[in-house]
């Protein structure tokens, strides 16, 4: 996002948090998120409306009135308030405005999960969904197929997720693959990371040959926290092919301490 849009998003995140905090966060957050996603669906198919809602030549009152005329009857009071606040802000371009509404929708759902004491569950489910898709390349290819309609791709993923994850995880994942700029695997990882960051954590993706115990996870999180200067959320993945040790990825940094990695280094050294 450009500078003006980033400033608007910072202010809107606070506005959203206050809106949710003043009500039943678990209920209102769970409504605001999907309703903002519905607004985005309309905007995606109507460029003129996107332009009109952020037109700097129009007064903020005129833009808010337009938002009310188009969306008012489809949104609850809290969602209308957030949308009116969004069109009142300055945006560098329509893409930032559209993406900003998506971010606000996600934040509302994360706040709903937090209020229901399920944010860590949602974070974990999104990470595990990324692993499922990574292990099922044919499914990921179908979910990323731009020739298929967004509805068809959402229906496919919904059939996979039915009864297996929380409703908030499902809503987030379905929106992410409907018009994704990333691979579905990356989109789910991004969502999981955003959930962790809302809790004040950074993510360490840790691959081991066997499942880590709770004690091992806690010890590793403490060590990585001291190294990176942040509280760390351990996203664990089991891959027996690494034989032993672990591979750790934090952001763009990758640390290969696996047995297979060490053997490969020896092989190259003697090649």
From Swiss-Prot:
Keywords: ATP synthesis, Cell membrane, CF(1), Hydrogen ion transport, Ion transport, Membrane, Transport. InterPro entries: ATP_synth_OSCP/delta_N_sf (IPR026015), ATPase_OSCP/d_CS (IPR020781), ATPase_OSCP/dsu (IPR000711). GO terms for cellular component: plasma membrane; proton-transporting ATP synthase complex. GO terms for molecular function: proton-transporting ATP synthase activity, rotational mechanism. It is a peripheral membrane protein. F(1)F(0) ATP synthase produces ATP from ADP in the presence of a proton or sodium gradient. F-type ATPases consist of two structural domains, F(1) containing the extramembraneous catalytic core and F(0) containing the membrane proton channel, linked together by a central stalk and a peripheral stalk. During catalysis, ATP synthesis in the catalytic domain of F(1) is coupled via a rotary mechanism of the central stalk subunits to proton translocation. PANTHER family: ATP SYNTHASE DELTA CHAIN. F-type ATPases have 2 components, F(1) - the catalytic core - and F(0) - the membrane proton channel. F(1) has five subunits: alpha(3), beta(3), gamma(1), delta(1), epsilon(1). F(0) has three main subunits: a(1), b(2) and c(10-14). The alpha and beta chains form an alternating ring which encloses part of the gamma chain. F(1) is attached to F(0) by a central stalk formed by the gamma and epsilon chains, while a peripheral stalk is formed by the delta and b chains. HAMAP family: ATP_synth_delta_bact. Belongs to the ATPase delta chain family. This is ATP synthase subunit delta.
């Amino acid at each position: 996002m450009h500078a003006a849009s980033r400033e608007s998003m910072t202010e809107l995140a606070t506005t959203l948090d206050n809106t949710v905090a003043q009500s039943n966060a678990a209920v209102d957050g769970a409504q605001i998120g999907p309703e903002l996603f519905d607004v985005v669906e309309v905007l995606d198919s109507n460029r003129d409306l996107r332009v009109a809602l952020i037109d700097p030549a129009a007064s903020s009152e005129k833009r808010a009135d337009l938002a009310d005329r188009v969306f008012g009857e489809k949104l609850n009071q809290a969602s209308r308030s957030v949308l009116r606040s969004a069109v009142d802000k300055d945006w560098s371009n329509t893409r930032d405005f559209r993406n900003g509404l998506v971010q606000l929708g996600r934040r509302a759902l994360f706040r709903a999960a937090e209020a229901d004491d399920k944010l860590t569950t949602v974070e974990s489910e999104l990470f595990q969904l990324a692993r499922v898709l990574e292990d099922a390349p044919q499914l990921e290819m179908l979910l990323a197929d731009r020739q298929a309609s967004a509805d068809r791709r959402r229906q496919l993923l919904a059939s996979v997720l039915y009864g297996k994850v929380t409703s908030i995880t499902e809503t987030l994942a379905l929106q992410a693959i409907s018009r994704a700029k990333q691979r579905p695997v990356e989109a789910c990882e991004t969502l999981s990371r955003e959930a962790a960051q809302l809790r004040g954590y950074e993510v360490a993706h840790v691959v081991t040959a066997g499942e880590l115990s709770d004690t091992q996870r806690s010890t590793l999180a403490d060590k990585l926290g001291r190294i990176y200067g942040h509280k760390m959320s351990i996203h664990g993945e089991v891959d027996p092919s690494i034989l032993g040790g672990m591979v750790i990825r934090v952001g763009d940094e990758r640390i290969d301490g696996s047995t297979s990695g060490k053997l490969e280094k020896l092989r190259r050294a003697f090649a």
